[in-house]
Swiss-Prot record:
Protein name per the record: 2''-aminoglycoside nucleotidyltransferase
Source organism of this protein record: Klebsiella pneumoniae
Taxon lineage: Bacteria, Pseudomonadati, Pseudomonadota, Gammaproteobacteria, Enterobacterales
Chain residues that bind kanamycin A: A100
Record field: catalytic activity: nucleoside triphosphate + gentamicin = diphosphate + 2''-nucleotidylgentamicin
Start and end residues of each stretch annotated as C-terminal domain: 93-177
Length: 177
């Protein structure tokens, strides 16, 4: 287990809790949180935050000795020490925060995962799979690193083949050329 990243995740979430700032773990760490175990080494920590409260997340990053490094079309990259944070906003949509363009329910209010004994909010299985569909549009799956192939397999197995195919059809119909 990568205790450096686990410790940092716990520090970030504790600081967010002090501010009543909901954060969701995304990407590979969300898969691990939902499974309740670390499945692989992670290159970064994906975080989803309320878009209108971005300044509060930036303040947490700075308080922990980090900085925002780069603006992206979907959010920003930050670093704390040697650890990379990939941060994406979610926006309030009637009754819950949602990631733009992701399936409804992308940011559950409840803590649906666990990282090293700490309950955490994490992106939904559907949002995780949706990200893999975007990735497959950019990089053919035959060219994916083994870690991404395995993480995708774990996510698909957890969600179920039928639900994955329904999502894939929705993704294709939304983004058909």
């Amino acid at each position: 287990m990568d205790t450096t990243q686990v410790t940092l995740i716990h520090k970030i979430l504790a600081a967010a809790d002090e501010r009543n700032l909901p954060l969701w773990i995304g990407g590979g760490w969300a898969i691990d949180a939902r499974l309740g175990r670390v499945t692989r080494k992670h290159d970064d920590i994906d975080l989803t935050f309320p878009g209108e409260r971005r300044g509060e997340l930036e303040a947490i990053v700075e308080m922990l000795g980090g900085r925002v490094m780069e603006e992206l079309d979907y959010g920003f990259l930050a670093e704390i020490g040697d650890e990379l944070l990939d941060c994406e906003p979610a926006w309030w949509a009637d009754e819950a925060y949602e990631i733009a363009e992701a399936p409804q329910g992308s940011c559950p209010e409840a803590a649906e995962g666990v990282i090293a004994g700490r309950p955490v909010r994490c992106n939904s299985w559907e949002a995780i799979i949706w990200d893999y569909f975007y990735y497959a549009d950019e990089v053919p799956p035959v060219d994916w690193p083994t870690k991404h192939i395995e993480s995708y397999r774990l996510a698909c197995t957890s969600l179920g083949a039928e639900k994955v195919e329904v999502l894939r059809a929705a993704f294709r119909s939304r983004y058909a050329a």
